[in-house]
């Protein structure tokens, strides 16, 4: 899921992705936006 959070590194997506999917969330930074996925 691409969420509307700007990023330059995946670490910036860690908290919003965990808020979305819980402790087992995965995160990537793609095209300046966070992408979250369930692991």
Swiss-Prot record:
Question: Has UniProt tagged this entry with the keyword Secreted?
Answer: yes
What is the name attached to this protein's record? Answer: Potassium channel toxin alpha-KTx 2.22
Localization of this protein: Secreted
Pfam families registered for this protein in UniProt: Toxin_2 (PF00451)
Q: Which UniProt keywords apply?
A: Disulfide bond, Ion channel impairing toxin, Neurotoxin, Potassium channel impairing toxin, Secreted, Toxin, Voltage-gated potassium channel impairing toxin
Q: Which GO terms describe its molecular function?
A: ion channel inhibitor activity; potassium channel regulator activity; toxin activity
Q: Where is this site: Basic residue of the functional dyad?
A: 28
Tissue expression profile of the protein: Expressed by the venom gland.
Record flagged with keyword Disulfide bond: yes
Organism from which the protein derives: Centruroides bonito (Scorpion)
Q: Which InterPro entries match?
A: Scorpion_toxin-like_sf, Scorpion_toxinS_K_inh
| Cysteines joined through disulfide linkages | 7-29, 13-34, 17-36
């Amino acid at each position: 899921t691409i969420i509307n959070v700007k990023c330059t590194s995946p670490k910036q997506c860690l908290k919003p992705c965990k808020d979305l999917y819980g402790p087992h969330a995965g995160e990537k930074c793609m095209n300046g936006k966070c992408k979250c996925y369930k692991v």
